[in-house]
């Protein structure tokens, strides 16, 4: 029998690093009866942090998925939960999770409030239009301030944050919450690790505050739902609990209100009420808009409804390698039904592939199931050719869904196998890791022959190299971190390239005339415009010319850095009946690019990081002075909870070892967060140094 989708929730848990995401998920597993003991992150025992590297470092690296049941108002809910990383180096995991989720629980630390990665993840959630509620965690910590965090969410994230609860006590005295929707107070029983809770009278010293914030809640709801406005002005108390919840749910789905809750996951308080509000307020797959895609055969829009009677359609959002079952593909099903043993069509590869097994995931463990229902999240085995972002569908009812866009890597390491025995193993390891992680790139330096591994940050690449050693038993040497510089064209130029080779027998010949210029839009890659008329170059050679330019972009003309974007307009050319072939035209394009780019004003670009430093006031001078020495561009300064928050844009090349240096400058009291911001042109004097370093020559003074 088909499951009622009204009672399905696909939710994520997201936040800045150390806000308590994994601890919260562990409590959910415990209270939902999935785990019979609580796994603690600080002890390396969290179920959801299953990788050795996660348990050692106490951080989440991959998005772990799990499924739980939750009873609310006599209905049994089916909840798929994805616990995502908070560290900036693993934003890709947040990105691909948000693409397939319907709702989000966004955690904030009651002490630290809105932090840099909170802002990044919040923007990603806005991009994917994911409805959310806020959970202010760590109310037991010194300096906890629920209402101040609500204010920050409103001001810094530009959202309509509305408290649904008030904390009873804080810091060591945090006991429970007052629920403003139903006007009741709840305290948790510590004897059974918060498994049970008791309703108590609202504390006398909180009655006035409760009235004030309940009125604010009613006003926010009445503002959204005009039918309640008259009631609000006549008698706010005449608005029933059902009316509040109905209007609140609509406002949350419409992304007009972010309900704010509070608790302490570590102290086992507030998690069950948060889960109840997930069921009450966050969307089911039925609440989302119908899915619109493109039929690849007709190029026309097609619509899929979240019903099992519609043709099957799903998105592959993650690939992982499991030591026991092999390649696992995580999918979100949007319509239809997927049964074990059935065939699906991949619209990218054009292949029909058999699904051998389907699993419901619980961290790194699998529970085999017979079918994946519409609106569900699961993992499947059986694909020979699958990539993150692929659309899977019924072959007779094809559809392509919008894929995912991932950020470009900004840092690289040169790596090499330690022994001859490690050569093949390294190749296998890299192939599997690149397949899993769209932000991990690998290429071979043509000058040195070295393998360059590129990723989102030092921690990202450290984890990758550690996984190569542990999972694939590869011993490797690694070089110092390298900045992922790029080259960019700044002006247009026209060029003719004649490629001719004659060495007895059939020769090689290709003649192309093209204009090379910067792209006018902000997209990456090659924009190729074919203006050939009259068959002066046969159309079967045009794809080879385009391929030649795409290959040439991988190595720029200044220092061999990749050219991130450019436009080529192919205007004219000629061919030879016997000597011209596809390879001749591809080589003509490659050679032509090298010559033309010299006249197209190529310049080197470097990655710029957005740096946020939180420091005690007495270290403000030394910290800003150090950032200036690192070519930092100051963006502003704020006060936050008795500390100074310094924001600056700083080139990545100046930031290696920065966290260690900052500890020295501030006697260990300042902290920094680094996020990739954008690319900028390198100053001319530094560009000369970079080129000299790459080419191994001295810089002329």
UniProtKB/Swiss-Prot annotation:
GTP binds at residues 15-22, 83-87, 137-140. Pfam families: EFG_C, EFG_III, EFG_IV, GTP_EFTU, GTP_EFTU_D2. It comes from the Bacteria. Keywords: Cytoplasm, Elongation factor, GTP-binding, Nucleotide-binding, Protein biosynthesis. Residues 6-286 form the tr-type G domain. InterPro entries: EFG_II, EFG_III, EFG_III/V, EFG_IV, EFG_V, EFG_V-like, EFTu-like_2, G_TR_CS. The keyword Cytoplasm applies. The keyword Disulfide bond does not apply. It is found in: Cytoplasm. GO terms for cellular component: cytoplasm. Catalyzes the GTP-dependent ribosomal translocation step during translation elongation. During this step, the ribosome changes from the pre-translocational (PRE) to the post-translocational (POST) state as the newly formed A-site-bound peptidyl-tRNA and P-site-bound deacylated tRNA move to the P and E sites, respectively. Catalyzes the coordinated movement of the two tRNA molecules, the mRNA and conformational changes in the ribosome. This is Elongation factor G. The lineage of its organism: Bacteria, Pseudomonadati, Bacteroidota, Cytophagia, Cytophagales. The gene is fusA.
